[in-house]
From Swiss-Prot:
Pfam families cross-referenced by the UniProt entry: CLP_protease
Protein name as catalogued: ATP-dependent Clp protease proteolytic subunit 1
Molecular-function GO terms, alphabetical: ATP-dependent peptidase activity; ATPase binding; serine-type endopeptidase activity
InterPro entries named in the record: ClpP (IPR001907), ClpP/crotonase-like_dom_sf (IPR029045), ClpP/TepA (IPR023562), ClpP_His_AS (IPR033135)
Organism, scientific name: Parasynechococcus marenigrum (strain WH8102)
Enzyme Commission numbers on file: 3.4.21.92
Gene field: clpP1
Length: 224
């Protein structure tokens, strides 16, 4: 059976149980109201501000959680932007495409922001944000490459799985060409091996639109 993943091997940080990366106990936020104090974990509190975190590898459980959060926020307000912060080494192609399809389907604009590393499927999701609203922090890193996979079994079974991973490769390359404006043959060439970019290089490539510069005290967004 094929394991078609677009996974960055340097960052092997899989946390399938949560759509966020949170080592140790979750930080909590206490809010005071007329009904007394209420405690929220920090990510639930940020979800109320329409902020979602993808800080882990991408698998089916993570995809289900992100899709559910996007659908919930769309139902809450179909006109207000959804922000997705991405620090991910990549993961399952099919799970990533489930997240991607939902990003394209929901009515609100989906803002994508890279912090840390957006590699492989993480970079693909970063590029799939709303045009003009794909951002990266100054010291983030972005990496694109082709899907990784392997198969075993009888020759015919291996042939079937090989055709599937080639189909996924062509699908991802075509979508990335649409989002970046790069020719399909350049995408195919660049993703043949790991291809790392700085935020400024990612702007030139078309993977993102702007680099966030907070040196002025406030969150200032500057053209790359």
């Amino acid at each position: 059976m094929i394991d078609a993943r677009s996974h960055h091997p340097i960052q092997n940080r899989w946390r399938a149980e949560m759509p966020i990366s949170a080592p140790g106990p979750l930080p909590t936020v206490v809010e005071q109201s007329g009904r007394g104090d209420r405690a929220f974990d920090i990510y639930s509190r940020l979800l109320r501000e329409r902020i979602i975190f993808l800080g882990t590898g991408v698998d089916d459980a993570v995809a289900d959680a992100l899709v559910a959060q996007m659908l919930f926020l769309e139902a809450e307000d179909p006109e207000k932007d959804i922000q997705i912060y991405i620090n991910s080494p990549g993961g399952s192609v099919t799970a990533g495409l489930a997240i991607y399809d939902t990003m394209q389907q929901v009515a609100p604009d989906v803002v994508t922001i890279c912090y840390g590393l957006a590699a492989s499927m993480g970079a693909f999701l970063l590029s799939g944000g709303c045009k003009g609203k794909r951002l990266a922090l100054p010291n983030a890193r972005i990496m694109i490459h082709q899907p990784l996979g392997g198969a075993q079994g009888q020759a015919v079974d291996i042939e079937i799985q090989a055709k599937e991973i080639l189909f996924l490769k062509e699908t991802l390359n075509g979508l990335m060409a649409d989002h970046t404006g790069q020719p399909l043959d350049k995408i195919a060439e660049d993703t043949d091996r790991d291809y790392f970019l700085s935020p400024a290089e990612a702007v030139q490539y078309g993977l993102i639109d702007r680099v966030v510069d907070s040196s002025g005290g406030e969150g200032i967004v500057t053209e790359g």
